Amino acid sequence: MRFWTVTGDPVPKGRPRVSVVGGFARMYTPAKTKKWEDRAEKIFRLNPQGDMECGPLKVIVDVYFKRPARLPKKGAAQYNHITRADLDNCIKAVIDAMQNAELMQDDKQVVRITASKWYTSSDDPARVEVSMQSIGSML
């Protein structure tokens, strides 16, 4: 199993934007999403922990948001994060960054996902913890 930690505030995958230049439509990823994906991709590339995966994959994503002041410092990690970013959009950003880092050939290889959102405990940094495992042939 491979494991990575992307520190910093998690950014969910934003909706693609469209602009018209010279009568032609151009689609692009929002700047905040692009910046986070680029940072995550760099972390994945610097520590690939093996070759590109070709078969079916299991991905585990744990998203940790900074603890709000209203929650107690002790035990904040036991609270699930239920506001702001949708978990599915956080997963999309992570998997896109993994594919861009050439950890997998295509995101369709991901056949099993386990994900959760939490608040960080005490003064821990906001982060995304990602692990990926090849699960062998599905035949």
Give the residues covered by each predicted segment.
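Acidic, proline/glycine-enriched N-terminal capping motif
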Residues: M1-L139
